[in-house]
A protein has these predicted regions:
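Mixed-charge (Asp/Glu-Lys/Arg
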Residues: 1-166
């Protein structure tokens, strides 16, 4: 049963990634902001997240204000790409963080990251989280973004305490 469940999740993840890749860049930027808000970043405020991506956006596609005053901000970069993201793109994003006087960022792509990109984020003082297409869809499924529940099953077992005679 577990094997079948995992296959369904994998198939759903692949189908969901297909939908995300077909979406417009603007929709994708809004999606990543929505996802981080649903995950609890920005607290319960409705105005905590904003998609800001456009030409001349300085390499920032979205922002999440973690507190009411906006003193602590997470900056987002969203790339709806087929090719893997390299360390050059991550360095550019870190440069954008420096330009914003920020120290936290999340770089999300529909593809993946090169080994160099993964290694680069380990060497910098800025806190940058990389989310690839697989992790993106996993987080979307876990947080019910772009998916809906169809059916659920309760698996039961014998309650041996009930049958214990005194």
């Amino acid at each position: 049963m577990e094997e079948g469940f995992q296959k369904i999740k994998k198939d759903l993840s692949q189908e969901l990634l297909g939908y995300v890749k077909q979406s417009s860049p603007r929709f994708f930027e809004r999606l990543v902001v929505d996802l981080l808000l649903v995950m609890g970043y920005g607290g319960s405020r409705k105005d905590a997240g904003q998609a800001v991506g456009q030409s001349g956006d300085g390499g920032i596609d979205g922002i999440i204000k973690e507190d009411k005053l906006g003193l602590d901000v997470i900056y987002l970069q969203a790339k709806r790409w087929e090719n893997v993201v390299g360390s050059k793109e991550i360095r550019n994003f870190v440069g954008s963080l420096v330009g914003q006087k920020a120290d936290k960022g999340v770089f999300i792509t529909t593809s993946g990251f090169t080994k160099d990109a993964l290694e680069y984020v380990k060497t910098i003082t800025h806190k940058v989280i990389l989310i690839d297409g697989d992790m993106l869809t996993q987080l979307m499924i876990e947080n019910n973004i772009g998916v809906s529940k169809v059916i659920s099953y309760d698996i039961k077992k014998i309650d041996s305490d009930y049958f214990a005679e005194e």
